[in-house]
Amino acid sequence: MNNYNKIWEIILNELSKIYSDEVFKETFSNIKKINQIEEKIIISVETEFIKNKIYKMYFEKIKKITKLKFEEKIIIEFVSEKNKKNSNFDDEKKHFENLKEKLENENQTYFSKIENNENNDEFQNNKYFETIEKEQIETKTDNDKNVEIENRKISFNKYNYGNTNPKYSFDNFVVGKSNNFAFKIAKKIAEEKKVTTNPLYIFGKAGIGKTHLIQAIGNHILKKTHSSKKVLYVKADGFIEEFTNQLRKAKMEDFNEKYRDIDLLLVDDIQIMAGATRTQMEFFKLFDYLYLNQKQIVITSDKQASELKNIMSRLTSRFEAGLMVDIQSPDFNHRLNILKKKILEFEPQNPLKIKKDVLDLIASSFVNNVREMEGALLRLLNYAQTFGYDIDINIANEALELLIKSKKSVSYDEDVLEKIKSVVSNFFNISVRDLMSKKRQQKYTLPRHIAMYLIKELKDIPYNIVGSFFKRNHSAVFKAYQKIKKNSQSDYELKKSLELILKKINS
């Protein structure tokens, strides 16, 4: 056999042509020691986690490279540093002899076409090649397998896998013209055995069903596989917070183990990552890792990838390389169907009968946001149930008076509000998340007050409604508005900033 260090160098060189630098270095820079027992090369890595990851993600490709590059039989085995210290050399040698005997009795078969090898000339000239195994040669003991199964059970509890809300399913998603394509694609992904569409990027305004659809994918897969798949749902702000906390506590190994040892990642409201540069860099590494290992990624946003602001281009380009599907605001008939479905869910055993004029009132009053419309219906149903009323148009007007009045009098354009928040954040070089937060440093409070002022000034929205956007009360918004209005008359820099921001908003 050739020098075993040289053999490993050749294997590493081929792996570096297949995987990105970041993925390659993160995994294979942790090699601690290389030993040899006859035809077997034993490679020691830093932790049990890295060892398991190599077996799960890279071992098949390592075996293919070994078979292609070397005429003699070579067996590669990975052990963690701790396990290697505790191993007995004689036992290891005996295990090797048993493995060797098994190897010589194996039937030969053929691998399918080699993947991911455009830059490798030798791979290009060898489109098909033999493998020495009919099934993967076992290099783990029964005890190792039992530990792995037990660890998988523990990780489900430790990392809260399968955390989707069970109320969201494909069965209770009301399909219409505005969301039919997105629905069909989502269901196709949930039912496929192999990953063929990656990533799936679903975009549309707030409150029109993106969260329902993304979680329905996860729930369908969990139900189909009896929860054996590792599905993880996370809102972008939750990802930011978790990454920041784990980084501060120096627990990034736990973070990586949680997010990389999964089968399906569901990320809601990716636009919230705007301006969070370090988090974006970490998400980029995670995205590439999952993508290269053929793990499904599904993302939602309030806008298409090309319109995302303060999100690094190498992320948006990856989103655009997948399948982008949009969900539009539902038309009138679609909204009526949604209301009827919700009524059935409210009292499934004894469905309420609500007259068409009542449903028409709700459907015509809440046009752009299904979530708001469902909230109005729920208020009406509970109002009538609490007071023992039969639901008619008069009771509906009475129960929903304030909600309908605010919708008619405000009639605000949600896109304009989002644009104001985005422009102000960009102008002051902070994230939208920080703008909407409760941080009290001057660099956050001034932009926040300006955003409140502009929303009130430009759209003439009541203080309490503006406050609801920022999770503040009427008084806080009133004070912010008065402060900016007064100071802009004497503070030249503030006045100039307002003019520049307004110019960007109107452009």
Swiss-Prot record:
It comes from the Bacteria. One of its GO terms (biological process) is DNA replication initiation. One of its GO terms (molecular function) is lipid binding. Disulfide bonds: none annotated. Pfam families: Bac_DnaA (PF00308), Bac_DnaA_C (PF08299), DnaA_N (PF11638). ATP binds at residues 207, 209-211. Residues 163-384 are annotated as: Domain III, AAA+ region. It is found in: Cytoplasm. Its main location: cytoplasm. Residues 385-507 are annotated as: Domain IV, binds dsDNA. GO terms for cellular component: cytoplasm; plasma membrane. Keywords: ATP-binding, Cytoplasm, DNA replication, DNA-binding, Lipid-binding, Nucleotide-binding. Domain I is involved in oligomerization and binding regulators, domain II is flexibile and of varying length in different bacteria, domain III forms the AAA+ region, while domain IV binds dsDNA. This is Chromosomal replication initiator protein DnaA. It comes from Onion yellows phytoplasma (strain OY-M).
